[in-house]
Amino acid sequence: MEKSATRQKALLIALPLLFSPLASAVQQAVLDTRGAPLITVNGLTFKDLNRDGKLNPYEDWRLPAAERAADLVSRMTLAEKAGVMMHGSAPTAGSVTGAGTQYDLNAAKTMIADRYVNSFITRLSGDNPAQMAEENNKLQQLAEATRLGIPLTISTDPRSSFQSLVGVSVSVGKFSKWPETLGLAAIGDEELVRRFADIVRQEYRAVGITEALSPQADLATEPRWPRIDGTFGEDPDLTKKMVRGYVTGMQNGKNGLNAQSVISIVKHWVGYGAAKDGWDSHNVYGKYAQFRQNNLQWHIDPFTGAFEAHAAGIMPTYSILRNASWHGKPIEQVGAGFNRFLLTDLLRGQYGFDGVILSDWLITNDCKGDCLTGVKPGEKPVPRGMPWGVEKLTPAERFVKAVNAGVDQFGGVTDSALLVQAVQDGKLTEARLDTSVNRILKQKFQTGLFERPYVNATQANDIVGRADWQQLADDTQARSLVLLQNNNLLPLRKGSRVWLHGIAANAAQEVGFIVVNTPEQADVALIRTHTPYEQPHKNFFFGSRHHEGSLAFRNDNPDYQAIVRASAKVPTLVTVYMERPAILTNVVDKTRAVVANFGVSDSVLLNRLMSGAAYTAKLPFELPSSMSAVRNQQPDLPYDSAKPLFPFGYGLPH
């Protein structure tokens, strides 16, 4: 009843005015409300969000976003301003990360009504888009009931590909399923990336998401780094082009935000990919990005694609840039979220960025005890804090340092009491908070949230994962395959007898193969595997989830054993999911064909292997020849390992 009443109210407002004399001068905005009263001024209708019976400038949809934001800030208390600078994790019952299918509305109400938080990341499942949309509507209803009626910005990590990892990405559910961004980079088509992001934008808006914590503009210069599969590879020029296309599609154009945009938060400024020894800076043991030379410019260049597309947000890296300097001047040894040079002097000053700087999650929290050492055997690790370089400061001092560095909003935090206290104690000025709050609220106005915070949940299932979009996603999966080796094996013939490892038998049968039980019975063996990895840090929350360490196939690797077994009996094709650059030296000497993939379904893969069409995708990073070469390359430089087995840009046509 409530949903249909909301829609009915919006229609009653909009339709009569289309035929009024006022329509020729000012067209009535469509307004959605589930609680805020409406007022009429000069024949036009507005929301009375603060319920004072008057039309205030921030409620006037005719005014520019900047003017509305300034008026709203002038009406806010210090606590309300501090709340805007928090970006929480939308709570679900029984999950510390916010995973699940329904929000904990009581916990959410505390955050929204009592702590004044109005930005949240959602980690809800996408298996039921209509339910997800209505859950987000419920959060917006809580926000509409607050004193000023400020709507929520709901964000998400990527949820459109094969990867799913807490703190990185979300399971795809019913959303269209594409290759990882590495696959888009392998294709190298900026317009395709724009189209991909435009589709994702429409899916996000359909379920009430208006902010994407993506893309990664990080350069994959350290082959062991666990976050490579979220990047566009290791080439600055290619990554710049891909990032520009992504932001353009996500924000619905190159000219800044509009009412159909999804805010793009480009990350992680800057140098994150130069991870020392490949360890990730979500973890204390990986808090350094290693710069052996002054190579920071390599890592900055991809972000210029974001600036050209007027990206609305930037997220700083957790990492400390060890040994990095800028024009001979050393860079302060603190994480980028605390680094005034990186955020204010370089990002805002030199590169002119004027959007929102959103910190990565939990940078003001402590990292003590098992956060430093890992939990004891049998204990379950939980996420703590990432205050790298400022561990000795108090949480209150970290807030002050981050704000003074240039941070506008704090990821993963909902308690703003320390920020309020810092202003009351004279450590920060309220005017400085006003600057950040203005930036954040302006984007809410630009994206149309004050007029239309709700979505039509009944339409979400028809929009999310649309058949024509998934067909394009499947075509993109196929295009992204990189042919590394083919000794007269491809294309495969329909009706061939195949022995499978890592591929579903029904998928092979559906495309016309005959599945057999042993390699000896087969005409060809088809093996799916992934880049090898180790997990030496299972006693750390993120370390227990990251794929770290060696990139080489060891003799005890079950997939490698399948390769050895099959290739001794029958021509063998191996496809490797390249979440990191795999070392294939002891694979290519056994196989007849090798295909790199970056996320592909069995059916798309098998159909492509039977096609005689030329392969056009190219490697977005080099594939090293050995772990010795990996250890000896410089983590801050692209494509610099000795004698790579396959260089950057490699790919056979046939």
From Swiss-Prot:
It catalyses: Hydrolysis of terminal, non-reducing beta-D-glucosyl residues with release of beta-D-glucose; Hydrolysis of (1->4)-beta-D-xylans, to remove successive D-xylose residues from the non-reducing termini. InterPro entries: Cellulose_Degrad_GH3, Glyco_hydro_3_C_sf, Glyco_hydro_3_N, Glyco_hydro_3_N_sf, Glycoside_hydrolase_SF. Residues 1-25 form the signal peptide. Its EC number is 3.2.1.21, 3.2.1.37. Its main location: periplasm. Exhibits both beta-glucosidase and beta-xylosidase activities. Belongs to the glycosyl hydrolase 3 family. This is Periplasmic beta-glucosidase/beta-xylosidase. It comes from Dickeya chrysanthemi. The lineage of its organism: Bacteria, Pseudomonadati, Pseudomonadota, Gammaproteobacteria, Enterobacterales. The gene is bgxA.
